[in-house]
From Swiss-Prot:
Pfam families, per database record: Clat_adaptor_s
Family: Belongs to the adaptor complexes small subunit family.
General function of this protein: Component of the adaptor complexes which link clathrin to receptors in coated vesicles. Clathrin-associated protein complexes are believed to interact with the cytoplasmic tails of membrane proteins, leading to their selection and concentration.
Cell membrane in keyword set: yes
Protein name: AP-2 complex subunit sigma
Keyword Zinc-finger: no
GO MF annotations, alphabetized: clathrin adaptor activity
PANTHER family per record: ADAPTOR COMPLEXES SMALL SUBUNIT FAMILY
Subunit annotation: Adaptor protein complex 2 (AP-2) is a heterotetramer composed of two large adaptins (alpha-type subunit apl3 and beta-type subunit apl1), a medium chain (mu-type subunit apm4) and a small adaptin (sigma-type subunit aps2).
Bilayer topology: Peripheral membrane protein
Gene: aps2
Database matches in InterPro entries: AP_complex_ssu, AP_mu_sigma_su, APS2, Longin-like_dom_sf
GO CC entries: AP-2 adaptor complex; intracellular membrane-bounded organelle
Length: 145
């Protein structure tokens, strides 16, 4: 179970968070961001699933929260539901840490968001599944500032 990348984009396609776990050139990254947004943005939340076949035997698992799309690219053989829950877990941690997280929190506190992301995902794999453990680590990091 390895991630290729994690993207958080708004409805307009602006990338608010990008973490790459596979080597891509800058041109490929720009192209992938556009392709992922064009793939997930027009999908109907009520009648279509949160899993989309992608290229090179991968798939996009995504979840929309308000105006943000949280997308992960995984191998086609990986368990989609595990990653869907991992996305939800990440958003729950963000929500608890920032207190009702919004897009502006991601923009202005990007360094904290990346720290949270690194606590949950490490080297493209799910590292921590305990919300309390992650929040305790983040409290310790906050005290260092």
């Amino acid at each position: 179970m390895v991630l290729s990348f994690i993207l958080v984009q708004n409805r307009q396609g602006k990338t608010r968070l990008a973490k790459w776990y596979a080597p891509y050139s800058d041109e490929e990254k720009v192209k992938l961001k556009g392709e992922v947004h064009r793939l997930v943005a027009p999908r109907d939340q009520k009648y279509q699933s949160n899993f989309v076949e992608f290229k090179r035997s991968t798939k996009i698992v995504y979840r929309r929260y308000a105006g943000l799309f949280f997308c992960v690219c995984v191998d086609a053989t990986d368990n989609e539901l595990a990653y869907l829950e991992a996305i939800h877990f990440f958003v729950e941690v963000l929500d608890q840490f920032f207190g009702n997280v919004c897009e502006l929190d991601l923009v202005f506190n990007f360094y904290k968001v990346y720290a949270i992301l690194d606590e949950v995902f490490l080297a493209g794999e799910i590292e921590e599944t305990s919300k309390q453990v992650v929040l305790t680590r983040l409290e310790h990091l906050d005290k260092l500032e």
